[in-house]
């Protein structure tokens, strides 16, 4: 059983050491991976400068060897293997029952249809068998377990809901998230034999993980798929229980409300942020963009800003990770644009971003100004869409109906072709912000374990030169920063206050006519303060706020059910701010309106002034900085590791794949196979020949790949571009040849 909380770690000592010129790290009592100059014998692991990105495992307990792709590699529920003990058991069952053609195979001869093998069915819409998941973890254990520093795991740990004979239930969702999480726990829990002395053996739930593991929520990890509410909810609490060892204790409160968090993988130096991309996802009907404070996506971006700003102050660097990649076909327009700005305006600390979901291997060049321009030009109205509305709506429809995430191979090929067109529109160096191309950011999309093509894994390598010296010689005295729990509590409090302010403004604006009518009916000779509309407004707001229950529904995620709720309402309903930094424009407008009201008490003009006051307050509120948008990049800072080679700059990655077509044949013949992941390509080799993976290198590669669209008359360049594009397409579909398919891979 997995522990339900992280409190069992309280007795662990701080573990870490820098020795022999190598950085060593392990967990402390707070569950953080830390470094130290103290020579300890517990849980020591050298930092290798590598990490694993794994995504979209999709284990399917109903996967059946010998089944066909059109049945999602499932057999009929009344089928029994024991009756027909044959490797191709479904085919035997069909023959024995006289059902040569399946009733939903549309007249196709079942015996001639390709059958699922032991490790899966490539180039199909089938999920992966349990045998593939087990073989994948075995290979990781035997080959890279001791060579990586952390794991970014970008979700989708459950089969698709694509077969109404086997409907997914909520307990299935949690069950397989638990199973996949347990695989990581078993493999990376401290083991005395492999990881050194200091513990009583491996496998005990009280022993910590030896490296950080950072999972993200996938669109198939929720019930129903794609649909995810703002928390706290049963689902968010259950996922927190399953991921309790992955989510730092100080952030569990935030996770229960938004299912996003971060881990410091090298404390004080490097972190990984796990985004909940379902709040940005077009196919999530419970999310409506990132423009309103009541949108969970808006709050998510505000949280992201708080975390990035704090990390900038601490001198840290950070990777962003998530399930759904930031492309216009996937994201709500406002979320797409705002995230692009966050990626570029924090270019001093963001090292890169990695995603899954699409099962194909490619990268996205993000240019926020281009995105903004395209959105504003669409039908002449900002925010209505990027490029074609029709295309967006079709994409959403395909996403909802097609079993393979967004679309099948033929659609993905068309998508990749559109990516090339996007590459062709990237401007040359003369129009870049600087020589580092720092007005761009790169989102990396990794292929998946699920064998829609071939199962894949990606191992990144990053620069750790000088890291040992930095850790071994900390500044004197070391800087002191607030605890993350304090930072995040302040975020919740400030966000609740912002929403309270907006409630006041909107209430006043909606009721200003009523207030004016009551004011007109009043006696001009009465005491100046008696039944003053200003006072009536204050009392009405207090009454309205008092009726809000922040512990349930949407408001629970906004206000967080925090203990400071009463103090927050006190501040919000007071006519004077309780602190000097209270920046509500409405208070200032109230003061002005009150003075105008006194001067014009006996005339309508003065009362009209009060009516205008509400409008001014609303306008002033809108005029405040949108916290879901980043501030401008400080002029005194330089671009960071993503742009200029330095500590933590990505050096390259190795893409691995497993040719399960070959391994399926071996298993069918002998009942065993030499299953393995082998190198498909590395970014250091031809034709990329990257020395490091800076943004400029990716932008230049994209421009070469897009050359055919822009310079049709330059035959030599076109030829070079086409040759490179063929390599790119082959890698996009993991060497399966899917780019040459003429028909969709399933109906």
Curated annotation (Swiss-Prot):
InterPro entries hit by this protein: ASMase/PPN1_MPP, EndopolyPtase_N1, Metallo-depent_PP-like
Alphabetically ordered keywords of this record: Glycoprotein, Hydrolase, Membrane, Signal-anchor, Transmembrane, Transmembrane helix, Vacuole
Post-translational modification: Processing by proteases in the vacuole may be required for activation.
One function term, GO molecular function aspect: exopolyphosphatase activity
Cytoplasmic side, ranges: 1
Topological region Vacuolar: 23-747
Membrane topology: Single-pass type II membrane protein
Keyword Glycosyltransferase: no
Record's keyword annotation contains Hydrolase: yes
Spans through the membrane: 2-22
Main location: membrane
A single GO BP: polyphosphate catabolic process
Enzyme Commission number(s): 3.6.1.10
Substrates-to-products reaction catalysed: [phosphate](n+1) + n H2O = (n+1) phosphate + n H(+)
Residue ranges with Basic residues bias: 591-625
Region of interest (Disordered), ranges: 570-640
Cofactor(s) needed by this chain: a divalent metal cation
Compartment(s) where it occurs, according to its Swiss-Prot or TrEMBL record: Vacuole membrane
Compositional bias annotation for Basic and acidic residues: 626-635
Family named by the database record: Belongs to the endopolyphosphatase PPN1 family.
Purpose: Catalyzes the hydrolysis of inorganic polyphosphate (polyP) chains of many hundreds of phosphate residues into shorter lengths.
Name used for this protein in its record: Endopolyphosphatase
Source species: Yarrowia lipolytica (strain CLIB 122 / E 150) (Yeast)
Gene: PPN1
């Amino acid at each position: 059983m997995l522990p339900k909380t992280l409190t069992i770690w309280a007795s662990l000592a701080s573990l870490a050491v820098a020795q022999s010129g190598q950085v060593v790290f392990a967990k402390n009592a707070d569950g953080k991976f830390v470094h130290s100059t103290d020579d300890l014998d517990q849980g020591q692991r050298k930092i290798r400068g590598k990490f694993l990105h794994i995504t979209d495992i999709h284990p399917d307990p109903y996967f059946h060897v010998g089944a066909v792709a059109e049945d999602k590699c499932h057999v009929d529920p009344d089928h029994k293997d024991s009756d027909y003990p044959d490797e191709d058991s479904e085919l035997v069952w069909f023959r024995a029952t006289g059902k040569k053609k399946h009733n939903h195979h549309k007249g196709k001869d079942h015996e001639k249809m390709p059958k699922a093998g032991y490790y899966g069915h490539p180039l199909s819409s089938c999920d992966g068998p349990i045998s593939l998941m087990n073989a994948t973890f075995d290979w990781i254990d035997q080959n890279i377990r001791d060579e990586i520093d952390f794991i970014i795991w970008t979700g989708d740990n459950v089969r698709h809901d694509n077969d109404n004979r086997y409907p997914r239930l909520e307990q299935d969702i949690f069950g397989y998230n638990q199973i996949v999480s347990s695989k990581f726990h078993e493999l990376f829990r401290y083991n005395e034999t492999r990881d050194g002395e200091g513990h009583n053996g491996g496998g005990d739930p009280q022993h910590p993980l030896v490296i950080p593991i950072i999972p993200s929520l996938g669109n198939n990890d929720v019930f129903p798929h794609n649909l995810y509410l703002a928390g706290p909810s049963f689902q968010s609490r259950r996922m927190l229980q399953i991921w309790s060892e992955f989510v730092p204790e100080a952030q569990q409160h935030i996770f229960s409300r938004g299912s996003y968090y971060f881990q410091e993988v090298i404390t004080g130096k490097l972190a990984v942020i796990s985004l909940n991309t379902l709040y940005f996802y077009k196919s999530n009907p419970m999310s409506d963009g990132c423009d309103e404070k009541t949108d969970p996506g808006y709050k998510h971006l505000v949280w992201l800003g708080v975390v990035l700003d704090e990390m900038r102050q601490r001198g840290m660097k950070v990777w962003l990770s998530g399930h759904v990649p930031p492309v216009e076909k996937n994201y709500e327009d406002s979320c797409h644009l705002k995230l692009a700005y966050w990626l570029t305006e924090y270019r001093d600390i963001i090292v890169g971003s990695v995603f899954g979901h699409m099962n194909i291997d490619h990268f996205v060049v993000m240019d926020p100004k281009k995105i903004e321009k395209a959105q504003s030009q669409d039908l002449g109205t900002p925010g209505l869409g990027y490029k074609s509305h029709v295309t967006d709506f079709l994409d959403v429809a395909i996403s909802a109906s097609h079993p393979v995430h967004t679309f099948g191979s033929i659609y993905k090929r068309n998508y990749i072709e559109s990516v090339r067109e996007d590459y062709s529109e990237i401007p040359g160096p003369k129009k870049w912000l600087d020589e580092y191309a720092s007005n761009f950011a790169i989102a990396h999309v990794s292929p998946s374990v699920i064998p829609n093509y071939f199962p894949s894994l990606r191992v990144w390598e990053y620069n750790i030169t000088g890291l040992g010296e930095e850790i071994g010689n900390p500044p004197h005295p070391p800087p002191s920063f607030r605890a993350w729990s304090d930072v995040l509590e302040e975020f919740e409090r400030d966000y609740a206050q912002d929403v309270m302010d907006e409630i006041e403004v909107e209430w006043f604006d909606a009721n200003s006519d009523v207030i004016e009518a009551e004011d007109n009916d009043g006696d001009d000779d009465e005491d100046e303060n008696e039944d003053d509309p200003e006072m009536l407004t204050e009392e009405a707001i207090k009454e309205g706020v008092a009726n809000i229950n922040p512990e349930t529904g949407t408001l629970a995620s906004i206000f967080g059910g925090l203990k400071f709720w009463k103090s927050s309402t006190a501040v919000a309903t007071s006519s004077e701010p309780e602190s000097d930094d209270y920046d509500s424009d409405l208070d200032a407008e109230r003061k002005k309106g009150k003075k105008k009201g006194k001067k014009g008490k006996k005339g309508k003009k003065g009362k009209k002034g009060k009516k205008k006051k509400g409008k001014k307050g609303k306008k002033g509120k809108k005029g405040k900085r949108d916290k879901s948008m980043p501030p401008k990049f400080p002029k005194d800072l330089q671009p960071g590791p993503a742009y200029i080679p330095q500590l933590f700059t990505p050096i390259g990655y190795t893409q691995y794949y497993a040719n399960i077509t070959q391994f399926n044949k071996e298993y069918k013949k002998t009942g065993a196979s030499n299953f393995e992941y082998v190198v498909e390509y590395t970014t250091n080799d031809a034709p990329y020949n990257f020395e490091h993976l800076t943004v400029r290198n990716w932008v230049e590669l994209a421009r070469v790949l897009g050359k055919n669209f822009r310079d049709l008359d330059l035959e030599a360049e076109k030829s070079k571009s086409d040759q490179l594009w063929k390599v790119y397409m082959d890698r996009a579909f993991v060497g399966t040849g899917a780019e040459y398919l003429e028909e969709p891979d399933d109906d």
